[in-house]
Amino acid sequence: MSAKKPMALVILDGWGYREDNANNAINNARTPVMDSLMANNPHTLISASGMDVGLPDGQMGNSEVGHTNIGAGRIVYQDLTRITKAIMDGEFQHNKVLVAAIDKAVAAGKAVHLMGLMSPGGVHSHEDHIYAAVEMAAARGAEKIYLHCFLDGRDTPPRSAEASLKRFQDLFAKLGKGRIASIVGRYYAMDRDNNWDRVEKAYDLLTLAQGEFTYDSAVEALQAAYAREENDEFVKATEIRAAGQESAAMQDGDALLFMNYRADRARQITRTFVPDFAGFSRKAFPALDFVMLTQYAADIPLQCAFGPASLENTYGEWLSKAGKTQLRISETEKYAHVTFFFNGGVENEFPGEERQLVASPKVATYDLQPEMSSKELTDKLVAAIKSGKYDAIICNYPNGDMVGHTGVYEAAVKACEAVDECIGRVVEAIKEVDGQLLITADHGNAEMMIDPETGGVHTAHTSLPVPLIYVGNKAISLKEGGKLSDLAPTMLALSDLDIPADMSGQVLYS
């Protein structure tokens, strides 16, 4: 069997394009490989945000959305737009699963709890959805409505939670019932790297109403956290309970609506509420009517309000149907993105699909090790390219995004330099086997490390375009005006394969 010449796609997570060098970790890093590719190879810029990826206009892209669009080869309307539309149409307020959970709790005189990432960030959740759910619970007769706020500071400025908390305090005052019952940073409640000691702190706060602190109001608790030098993301578990208020600990028969719609950081805390769980020993395990807003994983035996919209003939499925082999490879932090999200929400491998996982380093925050596990990842990727086993390879380097999120500029520069070195090795390997390579990003981040409006640290993604570079033996030029959903059709065309009718993306070269 002759060696295969792979079509590789390397996704540089968080590597956006911005001409201005000010506070731009990518432009100011020493990146001779990427500089040379942008100067000498076919290249263009493509859109990775807003309506072009199925998000609201102007909304920054993110990894889940980016990989879903890339793999689908069509614009995929994201849960954010889908749920917002349902609220506007009135469909949300009549959602059978939400209605049943609320009504059951109301009939039994029990509480309705809502938890989720409380911010307008729009990556994992949107506070507008939580607002609508609180209003819905109140309208359906719930008297005890408890809101458990996971604070952001990652997809939003590091100290921006106060506006959101005030908004909900005002809502409860207007309704004359319900209250904010707890606050905790997403570092604890939304871990995705099996740091169960963090998750346990959030779980105890929810189920036992036990935190490290108790304050009368959420805003007071937040100000105390800032005084302890804890930004939103890292706020320690705090119970909110004024004198004379009853505990909001979760009880048998209560309803719990988890209002995050993005799966990867919702899974761990959700699994703590499922009978079969071994992450830590639970001090309490209330029997709740738990509703996931969307399906976080097929193997979680809980109901969800908005089931997955199935995507037919994604890039991975189409390759599989054509009898081709493919490899998906990344570090822990972005492994779900090159597998589950890239496959349109399909958990299992397609026939002919292999997966390799490289463990991300166990550090508190990635500015402490900006290169992450890029060397080991590249060793495996280069070996895979040279193996002759794969028709297609999809790889993600997480550094630009994961280190960009820390807000530590010097570390982000080092992260970009580490990735550039790795890309040099990948390009060399592709040329050696006469393969083809597209280099792109799923969204921006590291190109803007200071917020131009506030002058503070910028830890969030951007809505700037991302590069697309071709390395290979075809004499092509890349078109302008493309978007992430054009990549799958482009790769199929480069591989001389048919493009399924389901893919509405365009081929980006001529």
Curated annotation (Swiss-Prot):
EC number: 5.4.2.12
Co-factor note (free text): Binds 2 manganese ions per subunit.
Family matches, as InterPro entries: Alkaline_phosphatase_core_sf (IPR017850), BPG-indep_PGM_N (IPR011258), Metalloenzyme (IPR006124), PGAM_B_sf (IPR036646), Pgm_bpd_ind (IPR005995)
Keywords: Glycolysis, Isomerase, Manganese, Metal-binding
Binding site for Mn(2+) 1: D401, H405, H461
Residues binding substrate, per UniProt: H124, R154, D155, R186, R192, R262, A263, D264, R265, K334
SUPFAM superfamilies per UniProt: 2,3-Bisphosphoglycerate-independent phosphoglycerate mutase, substrate-binding domain, Alkaline phosphatase-like
Enzyme class at the top of the EC tree: isomerase
UniProt binding sites for Mn(2+) 2: D13, S63, D442, H443
Example GO molecular function: phosphoglycerate mutase activity
Cofactors demanded by this protein: Mn(2+)
Residue stretches in coiled coil: none
Active site: S63
Pathway: Carbohydrate degradation; glycolysis; pyruvate from D-glyceraldehyde 3-phosphate: step 3/5
One of the GO BP terms on file: carbohydrate metabolic process
Catalytic activity, reaction form: (2R)-2-phosphoglycerate = (2R)-3-phosphoglycerate
GO CC list: cytosol
Assembly notes: Monomer.
Function: Catalyzes the interconversion of 2-phosphoglycerate and 3-phosphoglycerate.
Stated family: Belongs to the BPG-independent phosphoglycerate mutase family.
Name of protein: 2,3-bisphosphoglycerate-independent phosphoglycerate mutase
Species, as recorded: Vibrio cholerae serotype O1 (strain ATCC 39315 / El Tor Inaba N16961)
Gene name, Swiss-Prot/TrEMBL: gpmI
